[in-house]
């Protein structure tokens, strides 16, 4: 069972379209966005997920000012949560947050098998004390690299894909 992880798309529509195409090509149990979508119209790039029966959820980032519009546009696709999103997939407990502030305490809590975050625009994949994943940035504005992560929930590993 696999989880698609994307974050910090920051309205780079060309890169967002490419990233979602990559996600759709995988056999995913779910896709999560770890925040900083920016504009509500970015929802149209995720619109194919329900047709493929891939559940979606996200969390707001610090740059997501138009929360009402984002929630409304994403409503047919999946929910966007205020601070955190928790889910169990394949017997694995997963939490998604935007900022890195709580990553270490969440990872050490023993409550989660996977902690996903965004915000820093830097790839981070660690396996101790649990799987910690920051997919980097989909928008590519800061680093010049657009990346996402595919998390294998069977062996608790993550692969970074650049696009």
What role is predicted for each listed range?
Residues 2-10, 93-99, 131-136, 160-161:
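Active-site-proximal beta-strand elements of phosphoester/diester hydrolases
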Residues 32, 57-59, 114-116, 131-133, ...:
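Hydrophobic/aromatic beta-strand patches that form the interior of the parallel beta-sheet core
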Residues 23-26, 51, 76-79, 114-118, ...:
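Short, low-complexity, polar/charged sequence segments that are solvent-exposed and flexible
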Residues 82-122:
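Internal catalytic-core helix/loop-beta-alpha segment
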Residues 81-90, 110-111, 127-163:
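Binuclear metal-dependent phosphoesterase catalytic core
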Residues 2-88:
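Core catalytic region of metal-dependent phosphoesterases/phosphodiesterases
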Residues 23, 49, 106-111, 125-128:
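Alpha-helix C-terminal capping segments
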Residues 10-15, 38-41, 63-69, 101-106, ...:
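Active-site environment of divalent metal-dependent phosphoester hydrolases
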């Amino acid at each position: 069972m696999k989880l698609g992880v994307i974050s910090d798309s920051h309205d780079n529509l060309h890169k967002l379209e490419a990233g979602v195409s990559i996600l759709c090509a995988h056999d995913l149990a779910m896709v999560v966005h770890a925040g900083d979508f920016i504009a509500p119209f970015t929802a149209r790039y995720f619109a194919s997920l329900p047709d493929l029966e891939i559940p979606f959820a996200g969390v707001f980032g610090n740059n997501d000012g138009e929360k009402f519009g984002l929630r409304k546009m994403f409503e047919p696709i999946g929910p966007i949560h205020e601070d955190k999103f928790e889910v169990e997939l394949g017997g694995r407990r997963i939490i998604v947050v935007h900022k890195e502030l709580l990553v270490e305490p969440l990872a050490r809590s023993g409550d989660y098998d996977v902690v996903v975050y965004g915000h820093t625009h830097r790839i981070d994949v660690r396996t101790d004390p649990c799987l910690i994943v920051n997919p980097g940035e989909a928008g590519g504005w800061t680093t010049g690299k657009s990346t996402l992560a595919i998390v294998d929930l069977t062996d608790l590993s993550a692969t970074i894909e650049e696009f």
